[in-house]
Amino acid sequence: MVFAMLVVCWSIFLGLWMLVSRLKQSRDKICPPKGPPRLPWIGNLHQFPLKLLHLRLTEWSRTYGGFYTLKLGPVTAAVITDRQIAKEAFDRNSAISSTRHTNYATEFVTDGTHLLTMKYGALWREERKILQQTLKGSVCDNDHMRLIDAEQTQLMRDLLVNPSDYSAYIKRASTSIITSLVFGIRTPSCATLHLQELDAINDDWLQLLVIGGALSEDVFPVLKYIPSAFLGTFTKRLKGIRRRMRRLYGTMLNQTITRQRESPAPPARSMIDAVLNQREHFNLTDRQIEVLAGVTLEGGFDTTTSMLLVFVQAMTLHPECQERAYVEINALCGRHRIPQWSDRNQLPYVNMLLKETMRWRPVTTLSPPHVLEKDTTIRGTFLPQGSMLILNTWGLHQDPNVFIDPDRFDPMRYEGYTKLAADYANAPDAATRDHYTYGIGRRICPGIHLADRSMFLAIAKLIWGFRFEPQRDEQGNSIPIDSNPVTGYTVDKVQISPKPFACAVIPRDKEGEKTILREFGVASEVFADYNLDENASL
């Protein structure tokens, strides 16, 4: 219905737009297009799928190279599947390549204050600074690892109790880490109300970003002139997502404000505590604080959950990798101590395992498009102001010139890669970059330090405590696991995640079980620092 309405409106304005476009052509600098053939006026829009776009762009890169252009209506889009060109376009040209297009759907839902989709400017820099101060490496090491360790120890305890619900327990742990750090509010169980609501909102939001990306006002200029009432059920959907976001994030913000009034010096200080205590310095409205908190929740729980499920899938399919990692961990820790973050430098294979997990099935297959604020030329191709720059993360990770047999899961690709992802992202030589799952340029994921630490520790703990094996049917045969990126993964959202798969999570031994239960008792002392009000009204 929405698409049909857009087609009708597009037809109404097409004549005027064609006239304006012809007048502009006389001023535009023209260069031969390098990319798939395009049609007049619509360019490549008819070839632009809403599902599996990363596979289409990667397929084109095999034909047209690591840098080619598309035409999406009046907008030029440059697709980058080359490390050196990515470094040039997003890092060296970051002063002009860090903004976003105006997006009808996300503007409607968030009032233009969502950090992921917000245009580059003063507010973006202010909110980004808050996240960087909260999530930088030194703060993670000194302040956050205690909580992360405790939450992942509960994950191990939960898996002892009911291993068949491994997916739900992974989501709970990932959610509790981020809600605790953002609001000082834990997510103690899978039944916690805000977990269920956040999960539902995030699912709608990620699907909306796919549709919303197609509703850019720069790609469809007519959207600027269409009253929202004419978009019918789509507008109702946007209003519903907006209402639910405001209810959840606003409730959690109000809980934090109330707690501050009742206890001015809480044992554990959250990001929102810090923002509220420095309101005059940050100069943010309640609405901006609310959306900033929501951005952090959305980015922190779902991606980590999906990446840990990718890890579990990879271990189930590759027992030899799992066993090698276990031997390394057990040689260091034995059965009376669970791995800690401080063990990282002595666990090189676990580090390789993490990096290969991030490369093999990156949950973010394409970066949200950056937009040029000025005309520029990249590798001899002129790109006008307003052009999109799309980082093809999937294509970079599946490049056979960089990774031999790229679809094979092989942690040994990263032998000698001893640093964290942020170090390689900031390195001057693009050839040394480990992976692009966290993005690139000024808009690289601000949670890169937290996510890398959380993922490493979860992987080390899970391998120390459990074996991951295929489940068996009644005849004792292994139930196949589909890791195919087309059939085995979700494809209707901007992020991918494994579809449910049959995995047996088996505790390694009784001694390890005793250690997990003992360490969970210690973790419970950490949880006392956080608000456990899981029954607050939403």
From Swiss-Prot:
The gene is verH. Disulfide bonds: none annotated. Pathway: Secondary metabolite biosynthesis; terpenoid biosynthesis; Mycotoxin biosynthesis. The chain crosses the membrane at residues 2-21. Keywords: Heme, Iron, Membrane, Metal-binding, Monooxygenase, Oxidoreductase, Transmembrane, Transmembrane helix. It comes from the Eukaryota. One of its GO terms (biological process) is terpenoid biosynthetic process. GO terms for molecular function: heme binding; iron ion binding; monooxygenase activity; oxidoreductase activity, acting on paired donors, with incorporation or reduction of molecular oxygen. Its cofactor is heme. GO terms for cellular component: membrane. PANTHER family: CYTOCHROME P450 MONOOXYGENASE ALNH-RELATED, P450, PUTATIVE (EUROFUNG)-RELATED-RELATED. It is found in: Membrane. Heme binds at residue 445. It comes from Penicillium polonicum. It is an enzyme of class 1 (oxidoreductase). Coiled coil: none annotated. Belongs to the cytochrome P450 family. It is a single-pass membrane protein. CDD domains: CYP64-like. Its EC number is 1.-.-.-. This is Cytochrome P450 monooxygenase verH. SUPFAM superfamilies: Cytochrome P450. Cytochrome P450 monooxygenase; part of the gene cluster that mediates the biosynthesis of the neurotoxin verrucosidin, a methylated alpha-pyrone polyketide that inhibits oxidative phosphorylation in mitochondria and thereby causes neurological diseases. The carbon backbone of verrucosidin is synthesized by the HR-PKS verA, and further modified by the other verrucodidin cluster enzymes.
